[in-house]
Amino acid sequence: HKEYRRQRQMCIRDRAGVIQGYEARLAPDEVGLGLTVFVGVKVERHHERDAAQFRQEVSALPEVVAAHLVSGESDFLLQVVVPDLRAYETFLLGTLLKLTGVKDIRSNFAIQTVKPHGPLPLDHLGR
């Protein structure tokens, strides 16, 4: 009965939109993607249309596994995964720098991943 209740609760959450999907997490190194780069991007502020175009272009890039609009020094923070430094150079020069409205790019290379994926902190829901 315990397993049935757990599955029922997951089904209810799934229907309520709490669960956004299910995925297998691959080990990047094991599939030849040994370099993770966090890329801060500043964009030109001339037209909202350009910013929308930039968001659309970034969303279509398979190397970009996460993209966030952020406050601070950069406008966007991208998480890029590529095989190696040479592949990142090719991606940077051949793709990123050519996106609509890009003004400046700052690359930060991950030396070691300490916590790749954590669960959401849901303690506040129990209050």
Question: What are these language model-derived features?
Answer:
Residues A16-L26:
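Beta-hairpin "wing" of winged helix-turn-helix
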Residues D14-R15, S59:
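Alpha-helix C-terminal capping/helix-coil junction sites
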Residues R8, V37-V39, F76:
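Conserved beta-strand core positions
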Residues P28-R45:
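Short glycine-/aliphatic-rich beta-strand segments at the starts of folded cytosolic domains
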Residues R25-E30, V65-A66:
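Short beta-strand/turn micro-motifs at beta-sheet edges
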Residues V43-F109:
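Non-DNA-binding regulatory cores of transcription-related proteins
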Residues V82-R86, K115-R127:
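Short, low-order "capping/linker" segments at domain edges
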Residues H1-I12:
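Single conserved hydrophobic/aromatic residue that forms the stacking wall/gate
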